[in-house]
From Swiss-Prot:
Record Pfam families: bZIP_1 (PF00170)
Name assigned to this protein: bZIP transcription factor ABI5 homolog
Modified residues (Phosphoserine): S44
Effect of mutating S118A: Loss of transactivation activity
Post-translational modification: Phosphorylated at Ser-44 by SAPK6.
GO cellular component: nucleus
Length: 388
């Protein structure tokens, strides 16, 4: 019975891919996928539904609806760290390699097995509960998310979601909930793998860093922020993802090591590339580089530098003017002192000449008086003792 259900799920999946993929997945290879594919899907926490996570993580009597988004994300990452430390990530990566060597479609489950990088919640979303976020998602216009949901199946559901009924909170996968809530830009697991399968067919995870297409987010994709097309024939945008071929790696450059690989030399998965790009990083020749600053920041820096140069020039001009004024003032004072000194010297000469003349005149008067005195003592006096 379980084998028949798995075959029905596989037939539904084959209806969404090209005829070439349908031919490659036929024959004796279907039996291997019936046993491996469900394990690869369930190995990623993002492909589990909220009801399954609630039954495995929450305490009895408590559900995700009463938690705020901070507690909800913290519980998710704690569970994922526990899964990574127990070796689940490594085992699932080996399963994905077996599927790829057998059927050529193993990247559908292997792209999300490695632990995803953590992200920061927007400030308005931190204090809201899960129920409030779900209510806002349902209140958003239906036409914004209809094209994206019609183009792709829900991750981990095993088929295309029915469009005639409303999906409940418990039936939604963790990945879809985070995307629709606006916490992350794009999908972590299924969407990147589907993009590579629809354009260039199945891609081996070992070759994704060399020749496989890379998925880049072109805008926020959720129920509240729609994407207005991506130039590939999809009116609503293929979940906000643009598929572009990556540049070939340089000779001698090491490929980025995947944290979940068994041999330590496998190529970086699509999910890791998405996390690096979403966190503002660029991947070039196997290394991570920060993006260049925007032109606006460079223009502001140049304007600030020019204003500083103008201020420095004005300050230097004011300093030179002050020094020149001080020098002119000192020169004027020196000239005044020189003129005053010359005037005082002339006055001193005049006073000395006046004193000298007065002294000469006084000496002449004294000499005259002395001469007069000498003249008066030598004259004969008339005698009155005898008569003539």
């Amino acid at each position: 019975m379980a084998s028949e259900m798995s075959k029905n799920v596989k037939v539904t999946d084959d209806q969404e891919v090209t005829s070439q993929e349908r031919d490659q997945s036929g024959g004796t290879k279907v039996g291997g996928e019936e046993e491996i594919a469900p394990l690869a899907r369930q190995s990623s926490i993002l492909s589990l539904t909220l009801e399954e996570l609630q039954n495995s993580l929450c305490e009895p009597g408590r559900n995700f609806g009463s938690m705020n988004m901070d507690e909800f994300v913290a519980n998710i990452w704690n569970a994922e760290e526990f899964q990574a430390t127990t070796g689940g990530c490594k085992g699932a990566m080996e399963e994905a390699k077996v599927v790829d060597s057998g059927s050529g479609s193993g990247d559908a489950g292997g792209s999300g097995l490695c632990r995803q990088g953590s992200f920061s919640l927007p400030l308005p979303l931190c204090q809201k509960t899960v129920e409030e976020v779900w209510t806002e998602i349902n209140q958003a216009p239906a036409h914004t998310s209809a094209p994206a949901s019609a183009l792709q199946p829900h991750a981990g559901s095993g088929g295309v979601a029915a469009n005639d009924r409303q999906v409940t909170l418990g039936e939604m996968t963790l990945e879809d909930f985070l995307v629709k809530a606006g916490v992350v830009r794009g999908s972590f697991t299924g969407q990147a793998a589907m993009g590579s399968g629809m354009v260039n067919g199945p891609v081996n995870p070992m070759q994704q860093g060399q020749g496989g297409p890379m998925m880049f987010p072109v805008g926020p994709v959720n129920a509240m922020y729609p994407v207005m097309g991506d130039g590939m024939g999809y009116p609503g945008g293929y979940n906000g993802m643009a598929i572009v071929p990556p540049p070939p790696p340089a000779q001698g450059a090491m490929v980025v090591v995947s944290p979940g690989s068994s041999d330590g030399m496998s190529a970086m998965t699509h999910a890791d590339m998405m996390n690096c790009i979403g966190n503002g990083m660029m991947i070039e020749n196997g290394t991570r580089k920060r993006p260049h600053r925007e032109d606006g920041c460079a223009e502001k820096t140049v304007e600030r530098r020019q204003r500083r140069m103008i201020k420095n020039r004005e300050s230097a001009a004011r300093s030179r003017a002050r020094k020149q004024a001080y020098t002119v003032e000192l020169e004027a004072e020196l000239n005044y002192l020189k003129q005053e000194n010359a005037r005082l010297k002339e006055a001193e000469k005049t006073v000395l000449l006046t004193k000298k003349q007065m002294l000469v005149e006084k000496m002449m008067e004294q000499s005259k008086e002395k001469m007069n005195a000498n003249r008066g003592g030598s004259q004969l006096r008339r005698s009155g003792s005898c008569m003539w």
